[in-house]
């Protein structure tokens, strides 16, 4: 009986997250706006936003391996487009952009009427490593039924010009 109590105690200790060691490779997120701001944000309407324009067209490959035009994928929706590559290890680069997209998607999922008007596109600019199969794996679990999030790649960087 005493032995089983010791095993139970060890099990509780090892499974309790408060006893877990922190990863030795933690990184500081340096991108402004991701964490709490260290300054007061400007009052809405007190500044001018940059002009946005449509992204250039290009030849892309969807996660099913089908060749498409980037503009054909827009599907007359509001498009949020980020450029990434699956092997990016810079915490303030692609992983941060993907985390921000997840946050946006979670917000849009709460309002399907708006969510269905938005198309999110993560486009790899590393065709050598990011095949359609890799992009499909990268996008697994992002389909919510309301927000359309596509993971695309291309045959070459030249195809994006």
Give the residues covered by each predicted segment.
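N-terminal targeting signals for export/organelle localization
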Residues: 1-57, 61
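Short, flexible, glycine/charge-rich loop motifs used to bind or transfer phosphoryl groups or to couple energy/partner
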Residues: 48, 69-71, 110-111, 142
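Extracytoplasmic/periplasmic, Sec-exported soluble proteins
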Residues: 50-52, 62, 71-73, 89-96, ...
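Extracytoplasmic
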Residues: 53-55, 73-80, 115-118, 130, ...
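Short active-site neighborhood of thiol/selenol oxidoreductases, capturing the structured segment around
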Residues: 69-100, 120-121
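Structural microenvironment flanking redox-active thiols in thiol-disulfide oxidoreductases
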Residues: 96-161
């Amino acid at each position: 009986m005493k032995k089983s109590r010791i095993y139970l105690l060890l099990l509780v200790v090892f499974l309790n997250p408060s006893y877990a060691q922190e990863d030795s490779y933690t990184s500081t997120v340096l991108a402004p706006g991701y964490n709490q701001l260290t300054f007061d944000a400007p009052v809405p309407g007190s500044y001018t936003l940059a002009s946005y324009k449509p992204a250039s067209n290009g030849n892309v490959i969807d996660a099913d391996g089908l060749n498409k035009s980037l503009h054909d994928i827009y599907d007359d929706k509001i498009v949020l487009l980020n450029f990434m590559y699956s092997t990016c290890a810079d915490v303030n680069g692609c992983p941060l952009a993907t985390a921000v997209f997840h946050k946006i998607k979670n917000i849009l999922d709460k309002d399907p009427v708006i969510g269905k008007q938005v198309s999110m596109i993560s486009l790899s600019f590393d065709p050598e490593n990011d095949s359609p199969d890799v992009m499909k794996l990268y996008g697994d679990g992002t389909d919510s039924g309301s927000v359309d999030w596509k993971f695309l790649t291309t045959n070459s960087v030249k195809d994006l010009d």
